[in-house]
Amino acid sequence: MEFVSGYRDEFLDFTALLFGWFRKFVAERGAVGTSLEGRCRQLEAQIRRLPQDPALWVLHVLPNHSVGISLGQGAEPGPGPGLGTAWLLGDNPPLHLRDLSPYISFVSLEDGEEGEEEEEEDEEEEKREDGGAGSTEKVEPEEDRELAPTSRESPQETNPPGESEEAAREAGGGKDGCREDRVENETRPQKRKGQRSEAAPLHVSCLLLVTDEHGTILGIDLLVDGAQGTASWGSGTKDLAPWAYALLCHSMACPMGSGDPRKPRQLTVGDARLHRELESLVPRLGVKLAKTPMRTWGPRPGFTFASLRARTCHVCHRHSFEAKLTPCPQCSAVLYCGEACLRADWQRCPDDVSHRFWCPRLAAFMERAGELATLPFTYTAEVTSETFNKEAFLASRGLTRGYWTQLSMLIPGPGFSRHPRGNTPSLSLLRGGDPYQLLQGDGTALMPPVPPHPPRGVFGSWQDYYTWRGLSLDSPIAVLLTYPLTVYYVITHLVPQSFPELNIQNKQSLKIHVVEAGKEFDLVMVFWELLVLLPHVALELQFVGDGLPPESDEQHFTLQRDSLEVSVRPGSGISARPSSGTKEKGGRRDLQIKVSARPYHLFQGPKPDLVIGFNSGFALKDTWLRSLPRLQSLRVPAFFTESSEYSCVMDGQTMAVATGGGTSPPQPNPFRSPFRLRAADNCMSWYCNAFIFHLVYKPAQGSGARPAPGPPPPSPTPSAPPAPTRRRRGEKKPGRGARRRK
């Protein structure tokens, strides 16, 4: 699949952005000394002419004593590829944070402190054998050690940990894999308690971070022990001023977050000693330094790191701070850094992966942007904007605990309840008897009491559901309820339309398989709402997928509608009962939750009534090539959602390859999430559960059934890449309908 927007963990895009900016910064900065001084002098004149940012900027000084970075060797023998942006954003980028585990991990530098007396003799013997190699545990500062490398050190020693070979060459590096070789040579293997001998982790002794008062990250620098020749962080900031000043200059000339180059109206520093050392340097830039250093980590109580919106070129993956990015002049969907990348993408082989083939189709998809952004909520304009700042939106509403942490890259601090991924869902928090506890924020309750009477009809929009449920249109709970409401919409609308012979609305029990369910299982309690919407139906949800926590395999628990109790019953899992317990007419109906942590084609169990998959991305996982034939053999109604119309087309192609069947025309999901998803290399609109389609199975031999519908006739394909042209004011662009909202 060409685009992975909506399927890739946001933290990976964030990591690629950090490494891309840091690599550029290190390459241009060079080593500390005369070269750095000259570089800063060149930037000073440029920065003095920059426009002023009215926001306060903050230079954070964050010491680190306890966390190290361990660089792995990758899945293949030999040095790993590192974590350069080419690997993070290449043709086959990792999609999940767990995919980084073979290459990088975080380790505690305090491990092994217990039981040191028992291992003291072994450690002394190892030191003698290694020629006195020192430990990589926490190092105390020494007065005669320098915090930063000197000008005599080569530039490649300032490369970030895990950087790619290309980045090393740009910073003055040499042979392939030199980074990993240097780590192996300079850090001797250590025997640590509970671990096998391995290369000692790198220690990021200090992190310099430039942000504005709103939390937008503008620049970052890492001081790493050993590999960069620095000492560990002590109580002072000796020789840190040149590094900090270079970081400030580069952050103004090339801000990492968003916006054009600019200088702050005022700067504050989070360290008293560094503040004094910068008093004579910062005024050179035409920037006012605060009279006193910042005494707390954040300049204001509402501070939160903002969503970063640095875009990338679809072909070479350069970020917007490295090159000016413009969309294709014909479809306006794909971003390129210049004509060379546009032409390369236009002429890709085979033809059906080239932009020449996709350009008219993407133009048609872009015309749906206005329709997808049409939602009844009071915050619609904000959350459907291309510049939507999700982290700030959630933080401003106090949505920083429970299931809301699954939507944000920010991890709550001590004292905040968090549903850890991989644990039995909600077990510890269900004991209070409130099934909606994990959906709450820091303020008033988001979910009102369950209405005393079941709905008289079926709902087909957020507006209707919110009205019946007593919810304000200012409530963002739709972001979490998109999953159960989508299941409800499939049961009450789509199955009766596409499979009327099943008479599904009259069934008193339904077995539903939720396939490739990872994120959905992490939010499992949101499916409680199905008991409110379908009170007379006994539901069984079987979550299946190899992305589920292995420890959850074969778990089974029951959510019950009546009584106020919450209990754990041995042998049958969890039994949860809500706080509103009037028994419904027609008898009690339960929601059974079962888990199978394996690919769907390996799952053994009773035939379901319905199969549902959320944001499936058939083309992104090889197991679908075996799971789709399994569904073909079962021939049960199978509905899937996708985050874009483009993804639906790709799923149809995968279905045709895997089974010879097809997919129904996708239709917008009225219960899609209102939050627009980030897209790094394109301008298309992506929303969780945006479109729905169902599988069209290949007719069985001799059945006489009609074959699966083929794909729609292709749009005419241009023969040459579109040339950027200027349109006169007032002239409309041909072939385009409603434009997406800004």
Curated annotation (Swiss-Prot):
Residues 109-199, 565-590, 701-742 are annotated as: Disordered. Residues 708-724 have a biased composition (Pro residues). One of its GO terms (biological process) is spermatid development. Residues 725-742 have a biased composition (Basic residues). It is linked to Spermatogenic failure 14: A disorder resulting in the absence (azoospermia) or reduction (oligozoospermia) of sperm in the semen, leading to male infertility. PANTHER family: ZINC FINGER MYND DOMAIN-CONTAINING PROTEIN 15. This is Zinc finger MYND domain-containing protein 15. The lineage of its organism: Eukaryota, Metazoa, Chordata, Craniata, Vertebrata. The gene is ZMYND15.
